[in-house]
Amino acid sequence: MNHKSKKRIKEAKRSARPELKDSQDWCRHNYCEVFSLNPSTVLDNVERVDAAQLTTEEFIERYEKPYKPVVIINATAGWPANEKWTLERLKRKYRNQKFKCGEDNDGYSVKMKMKYYIDYMEGTRDDSPLYIFDSSYGEHPKRKKILEDYEVPKYFRDDLFQFTGEKRRPPYRWFVMGPPRSGTGIHIDPLGTSAWNSLVHGHKRWCLFPTNTPRELIKVTRDEGGNQQDEAITWFNVVYPRTQLPSWPPEFKPLEILQKPGETVFVPGGWWHVVLNFDTAIAVTQNFASCSNFPVVWHKTVRGRPKLSRKWYRILKQERPELAALADTVDLQESTGIASDSSSDSSSSSSSSSSESCSEDDSSSGAEMMSRRKKKRRLCNGMGNGDITTQDDCASKERSSSR
């Protein structure tokens, strides 16, 4: 690794994780040596279905409507990404393009050129390495070529947030890439949206918990996690062993997945989930609002993003009047029954948010969270325009990429 590469990597690490003062802090737990990344340790107890044999209607009835996680095989067949997304080809094609690999303490993106990031990936011994989790590639003149390498699987093409306009809609798609031990800390995706994650290369370990799982049961405390409180590897080291004890409540036993190349994980709205990369992993993931989850997403958007909801409603009235009519029937005073994770209101660059409470509505999001943090947060992708929880949506999927 040349001097310039080392310098750029050091700068990115210092910006993304200022609480880690030196190289010793980054490797303090020696997870590179002592943490097992053996696939045989994963129970892998989630149902798998074949995209070639499952219609969209069957998927909606069997999985989406009942909020049931599932792993889909063959949904990525024919993707150019299967051949194009190798380290060698990505380094060649996007060599000097910058990708987000974290956030600083003011909420600004920390970015690294692909050539430097791959140098970092290939040599890191960090406990929880920096992780590319980039949501802006689709708007960039060169990086948007990534969009040509995959297509949204047939089950997830209902994209109702498109009716808010591209400039206003919350971030919803991410190109993700990271080395072993990188990952995404435990969280619930924002605004009641569901998600899909298609893995092109590598292996990912998932744990998922139902929406009614008590937050205090599955969150790492500051005393337990210290500076690595919000990291996926910390969660698997601290919390996961408890889930296997006889004393763990049986109704909150995790679903476990060892996601393999070519597999797509469906995460219904409200499900807690944590993801750890077992090896070099390259994937694409998107959040979505569909006709099935629209009542919940609408409820949470009105409560958490009121200005966005008004714009959304006006366009739905014109383009999808049946959904505007459905929105009129949603009782905003009743709980949705689908939890919200207030720690997803902030990236893990704001560790103070990790002790906030989880609730079944969005009544405490927004102004309260922002005033408690008292941080200057950049509006993500030019969105916001008066919505106080704009940053909440930007950071949910990016929590451990920035910490």
Swiss-Prot record:
Positions of the UniProt region annotated as Disordered: 336-403
Required cofactor names: Fe(2+)
InterPro entries: JmjC_dom, JMJD6_ArgDemeth/LysHydrox
Residue positions of motif Nuclear localization signal 3: 141-145
EC number: 1.14.11.-
Binding site for Fe cation: H187, D189, H273
Record-listed substrate binding positions: T184, K204
Gene Ontology MF, one: metal ion binding
Uppermost EC category: oxidoreductase
Co-factor: note: Binds 1 Fe(2+) ion per subunit.
Biological process according to GO: cell differentiation; mRNA processing; peptidyl-lysine hydroxylation to 5-hydroxy-L-lysine; phagocytosis; protein homooligomerization; regulation of mRNA splicing, via spliceosome; RNA splicing; sprouting angiogenesis
Pfam families per the UniProt record, alphabetical: JmjC (PF02373)
Residue span of motif Nuclear localization signal 1: 6-10
Residues bound to 2-oxoglutarate: N197, T285
Positions with biased composition (Low complexity): 340-357
Motif range (Nuclear localization signal 4): 167-170
Post-translational modification: Hydroxylates its own N-terminus; hydroxylation is required for homooligomerization.
Motif (Nuclear localization signal 2): 91-95
Extent of motif Nuclear localization signal 5: 373-378
Gene Ontology terms: cellular component: cytoplasm; nucleolus; nucleoplasm; nucleus
Superkingdom per UniProt: Eukaryota
Family (UniProt): Belongs to the JMJD6 family.
Domain comment in the entry: The nuclear localization signal motifs are necessary and sufficient to target it into the nucleus.
Main function: Dioxygenase that can both act as a arginine demethylase and a lysyl-hydroxylase. Acts as a lysyl-hydroxylase that catalyzes 5-hydroxylation on specific lysine residues of target proteins such as u2af2/u2af65 and LUC7L2. Regulates RNA splicing by mediating 5-hydroxylation of u2af2/u2af65, affecting the pre-mRNA splicing activity of u2af2/u2af65. Hydroxylates its own N-terminus, which is required for homooligomerization. In addition to peptidyl-lysine 5-dioxygenase activity, may act as an RNA hydroxylase, as suggested by its ability to bind single strand RNA.
Name of the protein: Bifunctional arginine demethylase and lysyl-hydroxylase JMJD6-B
Organism from which the protein derives: Xenopus laevis
Gene that produces this protein: jmjd6-b
